[in-house]
Amino acid sequence: MNALRLGSYTFSSRLILGTGKFSSVSAMIEAVRASGSQLVTVALRRFNREQAEDDLFGPLSEIEGLTLMPNTSGAATAKEAVKAAHISRELSGSPFIKVEIHPNPHHLMPDPIETYEACKILAAEEFIVMPYIPADPVLAKRLEEVGCSSVMPLGSAIGSGQGLSTSAMVQLIIRESSIPVIVDAGLRSPSEACAAMEMGCEAVLVNSAIAVARDPAAMAGAFARAVEAGYDARNAGLMQRSGSAVATSPLTSFLGAGS
């Protein structure tokens, strides 16, 4: 695969991992290693060096070639997200920030207005801004215009496992974007990650589907292979769909050709 470029960084893996929901830190670390991911997202509250059982920064920092992308999960307003981003950059040293603002705990849908306001500020402060957004082509374009390095439309609701229910809108975003489009949230299976790559996404972010699997490390490896397969298939050139059968062999008579 060609390298994924985000800001001034390049990554050979196009699978981004979330680090929540795992049964233990060791299970999460095993999954990250098995995935080959070079970019993982971590909630601010998991930067806790004083309590080793809650701290992910230390263990993740030991993985060579891994870049941390703090996120603002828990923020309900642009102001809270900007504050979380500042603290995260100070603690991690990472220029990346995944902007997540979902004030309603019942559906966890991203707030488009607060997200836009936070991204304007953070992009001006030279963060590598990667916002989690509804699958809204107009919002995606506005975020590109203010300097976001990518947009991350949801495939479906966080943790729902409902797959690519927004695929039609995601395809519109891809068509109109000149920055990477990364599907985030709702993916349940490697086949759905493959489909996202085939439709034109530059990467996918997966958390729950790996974290709650019976064998998270094995599932992480399966997602990694699916992402690579989808990317390669897209670049190889997928055949066009047809409304009717198209013969693969000549239909002319041949049985009586020698008589």
From Swiss-Prot:
Homotetramer. Forms heterodimers with either ThiH or ThiS. This is Thiazole synthase. HAMAP family: ThiG. One of its GO terms (biological process) is thiamine diphosphate biosynthetic process. Its main location: cytoplasm. It is found in: Cytoplasm. It catalyses: [ThiS sulfur-carrier protein]-C-terminal-Gly-aminoethanethioate + 2-iminoacetate + 1-deoxy-D-xylulose 5-phosphate = [ThiS sulfur-carrier protein]-C-terminal Gly-Gly + 2-[(2R,5Z)-2-carboxy-4-methylthiazol-5(2H)-ylidene]ethyl phosphate + 2 H2O + H(+). CDD domains: ThiG. Pathway: Cofactor biosynthesis; thiamine diphosphate biosynthesis. Its EC number is 2.8.1.10. GO terms for cellular component: cytoplasm. Catalyzes the rearrangement of 1-deoxy-D-xylulose 5-phosphate (DXP) to produce the thiazole phosphate moiety of thiamine. Sulfur is provided by the thiocarboxylate moiety of the carrier protein ThiS. In vitro, sulfur can be provided by H(2)S. Pfam families: ThiG. Belongs to the ThiG family. InterPro entries: Aldolase_TIM (IPR013785), Thiazole_synthase_ThiG (IPR033983), ThiG (IPR008867). Keywords: Cytoplasm, Schiff base, Thiamine biosynthesis, Transferase. It comes from the Bacteria. The active site is at 98 (schiff-base intermediate with dxp). The gene is thiG.
